[in-house]
């Protein structure tokens, strides 16, 4: 029941190198996944080339998916690492019930001896619940998330994924831009192939006012996660920075992509509602607003237009939130 990974390098000409990779399963070598890419040589081996890093991440995701796809009942699992991977899949479903299931899985993984990653993802999970404004969150959510961050950092302070998750949590719950910058920089240095690390650094730069650099970093995160089953997350990360750097059409396209792959992910719906209104597409704005209201019962066009606490801050900073046009379809 083992998996076999094969990687082959080849030359197409003097300046180009290609990589082929495949994952086989069992004695028969049944194909699970295959991929290939090529890049230009510029002296040193192209280990940091975005296409090659992306191919490596796709291979890792394919292996992880193959190991979990046949599992139908998580209650039978006694492997902490496998439980953590299943929980991460549930987290990126982004539905309230899926996040609750993921939290239970991660708690069990901790009881089975999981590393700091389980604590970090439990903190990240609560961050998502907070931003998504889920109805089932408790008043102690921020404090619980902070304790989980402390636990994760004490146990594995040099784990790139732990640092990225803690960076995100510190930024959103504590508004600590400096901490997010430092943690995400170290996360990137420890693993430059980690898209969550680049995404965290992009978000830190965004809130630090370095918008153009934030967008470049978000583009990098999206590119190296190309083909990921969680692509909607990276698409929306780039949507944020596109909006803040005045790239309205790009932001709309990215939000549409994120919504297509995760219809119940609320932030793309919020941004599409506002961006369609600003682009003089009132019918589309109204349609997105109606979808959002089914997921977020206290949503209103008026609140989006005038409530500073409503979670679309980058749109307000960018000037792309046209309150008059948003309100034009209110009621």
Residue locations for each model-derived region?
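Canonical positions in the second alpha-helix
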Residues: 108-109, 151-152, 186-187, 220-224, ...
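TPR alpha-solenoid repeat register
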Residues: 116-119, 162, 197, 231-234, ...
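Catalytic-center loop of serine/cysteine hydrolases
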Residues: 1-88, 92, 97
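Short coil turns that delineate tetratricopeptide repeat
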Residues: 111-114, 154-157, 192, 226-229, ...
């Amino acid at each position: 029941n083992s998996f076999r990974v094969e990687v082959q390098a080849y030359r197409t000409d003097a300046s180009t190198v290609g990589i082929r990779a495949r994952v086989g399963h069992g004695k028969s070598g049944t194909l699970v996944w295959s991929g290939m890419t090529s890049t230009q040589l510029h002296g040193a081996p192209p280990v940091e080339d975005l296409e090659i890093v992306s191919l490596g991440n796709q291979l890792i995701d394919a292996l992880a998916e193959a190991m979990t796809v046949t599992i139908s009942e998580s209650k039978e699992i006694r492997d902490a690492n496998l439980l953590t991977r299943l929980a991460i899949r549930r987290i990126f479903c982004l539905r309230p019930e899926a996040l609750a299931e993921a939290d239970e899985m991660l708690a069990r993984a901790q009881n089975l001896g999981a590393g700091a990653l389980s604590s970090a993802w439990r903190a990240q999970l609560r961050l998502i619940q907070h931003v998504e404004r889920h109805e089932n969150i408790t008043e102690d959510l921020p404090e619980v998330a902070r304790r989980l961050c402390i636990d994760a950092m004490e146990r594995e302070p040099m784990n790139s994924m732990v640092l990225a998750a803690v960076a995100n949590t510190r930024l959103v719950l504590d508004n600590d831009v400096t901490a997010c910058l430092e943690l995400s920089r170290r996360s990137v240095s420890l693993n430059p192939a980690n898209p969550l690390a680049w995404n965290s650094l992009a978000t830190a730069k965004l809130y630090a006012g370095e918008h153009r650099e934030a967008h470049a970093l978000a583009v990098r995160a999206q590119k190296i996660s190309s083909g990921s089953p969680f692509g909607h997350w990276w698409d929306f990360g780039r949507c944020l920075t596109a909006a803040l750097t005045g790239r309205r059409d790009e932001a709309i396209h990215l939000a549409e992509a994120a919504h297509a792959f995760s219809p119940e992910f609320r932030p793309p719906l919020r941004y599409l509602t506002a961006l369609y209104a600003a682009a003089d597409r009132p019918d589309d704005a109204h349609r997105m607003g109606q979808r959002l209201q089914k997921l977020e019962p206290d949503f209103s066009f008026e609140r989006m237009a005038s409530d500073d606490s409503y979670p679309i801050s980058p749109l307000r900073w960018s000037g792309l939130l046209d309150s008059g046009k948003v309100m034009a379809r209110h009621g």
